């Protein structure tokens, strides 16, 4: 397993542990996930779903954490100690990560891609004020506009 994969799995598990600290975040489960990250990710997702904590915002945060993972193979041996340390650091980053609302996420993705609200408004065929109200959290983003954002700008909400 590559180092980037280990870090992504650690961050994703940290996000889940922040949502369910008494179940996913217990020391024995964290230690198990540290040694066998794929098993930990699967168990964490199972607990998130069964406890109804997998909201769209949390799902998006986990999806973004796992974005760019190229290989996910796990053998019967635990991770080497160096990769366990990498996993632990990424776990703490995920544990402290803020779960963004739809508007905050849109604002962050526009900033990351170097796009302005005018460009987003043009892509969605709405006014700049409408995009501003989405980013400010005043109004929810309609499903049709979410699809346009995904299609034209590559922003999945």
Describe each PLM feature range.
Residues 1-97:
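Intrinsic-disorder/low-complexity detector
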Residues 40, 101-105, 126:
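Alpha-helix N-cap/N′ positions at the starts of helices
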Residues 92-113:
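A short, Lys/Arg-rich alpha-helix, primarily the initiator
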Residues 110, 121, 150:
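The alpha-helix within a helix-turn-helix
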Residues 114-133:
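Short alpha-helical DNA-recognition segment
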Residues 136-138:
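Residue-level detection of the helix-turn-helix DNA-binding "recognition helix"
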Residues 143-157:
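DNA major-groove recognition helix of helix-turn-helix/homeodomain DNA-binding modules
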């Amino acid at each position: 397993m590559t180092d980037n994969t280990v870090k992504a799995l650690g961050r994703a598990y940290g996000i889940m542990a922040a949502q369910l600290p008494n179940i996913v975040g217990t020391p024995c489960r964290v230690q198990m996930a540290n040694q066998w990250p794929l098993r930990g990710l699967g168990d964490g997702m199972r607990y998130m779903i069964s406890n109804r904590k997998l909201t769209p915002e949390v799902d998006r945060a986990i999806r973004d954490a796992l974005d760019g993972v190229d290989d996910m193979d796990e053998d019967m041996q635990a991770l080497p100690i160096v990769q366990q340390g990498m996993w632990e650091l990424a776990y703490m980053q995920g544990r402290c990560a803020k779960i963004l609302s739809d508007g905050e996420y849109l604002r962050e993705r526009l900033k990351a891609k170097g796009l302005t609200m005018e460009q987003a408004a043009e892509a969605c065929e709405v006014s700049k004020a409408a995009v501003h109200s989405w980013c400010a959290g005043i109004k929810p983003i309609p499903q049709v506009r979410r699809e346009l954002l995904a299609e034209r700008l590559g922003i999945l909400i």
